[in-house]
From Swiss-Prot:
PANTHER family: SLR0848 PROTEIN (PTHR38010:SF1). It comes from the Bacteria. This is Uncharacterized protein ML1661. It comes from Mycobacterium leprae (strain TN). The lineage of its organism: Bacteria, Bacillati, Actinomycetota, Actinomycetes, Mycobacteriales. Gene3D superfamilies: F1F0 ATP synthase subunit B, membrane domain (1.20.5.620). To M.tuberculosis Rv2927c.
């Protein structure tokens, strides 16, 4: 670009130093020198176009880098969310299995306890009947009452153990909220990755647009300078032909 301005300065110097035409505002300039300077300007301008292409290539490279970075972030977020979800599911399955095992164990213990109590009550009733035949009826009634009471207590204990086991199962099942928390976290990570990708694309577009605007302003100034030079050349060429005739 330096050669363009240098050639324009030389054109200006030629016009300023040219010999004037009497009784006109025109002047006589050396046609060969002027045409040579114009050729120099034409040769220098393609170099600036190459610079513009370099800016466009840089923009494409930045866009590709931003897209690759965004794709990497989205892939990492997806992998992490899948890992969290898998871990949460495994944890929920383990908790459910532990709860079921605990409920089964408590129910089995309650049944065994009830059976032991029933056996003890029956043995006690038989012993009382054998020892006190004379009080057979009274003893039998007392034994039966005691048996019924023990059975009822055993049933109450059994039902209580079952209810406690169900409550414990419900409490453990409620821990499935871990899965929901993992889903929410994975969604947040993916949204963050998309937002970061959009921000990088926006910054890249702004940078490229600013550079192109600067280059556009520079080229417009150059074209205006060349236009003025051509206008001056045409004016000078018309005057020279008039003097020759």
């Amino acid at each position: 670009m330096y050669r363009v301005f240098e050639a324009l300065d030389e054109l200006g110097a030629i016009v300023e130093e040219a010999r004037g035409v009497p009784m006109t505002a025109g002047c006589v300039v050396p046609r060969g020198d002027v045409l040579e300077l114009i050729d120099d300007i034409k040769d220098a301008i393609p170099g600036e176009l190459d610079d513009a292409q370099d800016v466009l290539d840089a923009r494409d490279a930045m866009l590709n880098d931003a897209k690759a970075h965004a794709d990497s972030m989205v892939s990492s977020a997806t992998t992490e969310s899948e890992s969290l979800l898998s871990h949460a599911r495994a944890e929920a399955d383990r908790i459910l299995s532990d709860a079921k095992s605990q409920v089964d164990r408590m129910a089995s213990e309650a049944r065994q306890h009830s059976e032991r109590m029933l056996g003890d009550a029956r043995e006690e009733s038989i012993r009382i009947a054998t020892v006190a035949k004379r009080e057979y009826e009274a003893s039998l009634n007392r034994a039966q009452s005691e048996c019924d009471r023990l059975i009822e207590n055993g049933n109450i204990s059994y039902e209580k153990a079952i209810q406690e086991g169900i409550k414990e199962q419900q409490r453990l099942v409620s821990q499935n909220e871990v899965v929901q928390a993992a889903n929410a976290e994975s969604t947040r990570l993916i949204d963050t990755a998309h937002a970061e990708a959009d921000r990088l694309r926006g910054e890249c577009d702004i940078y490229v647009d600013n550079k192109l605007a600067e280059f556009e302003e520079f080229l417009n100034g150059t074209l205006r300078s060349v236009g003025r030079g051509r206008h001056q050349l045409r004016t000078a060429a018309g005057t020279h032909d008039y003097v020759t005739r």
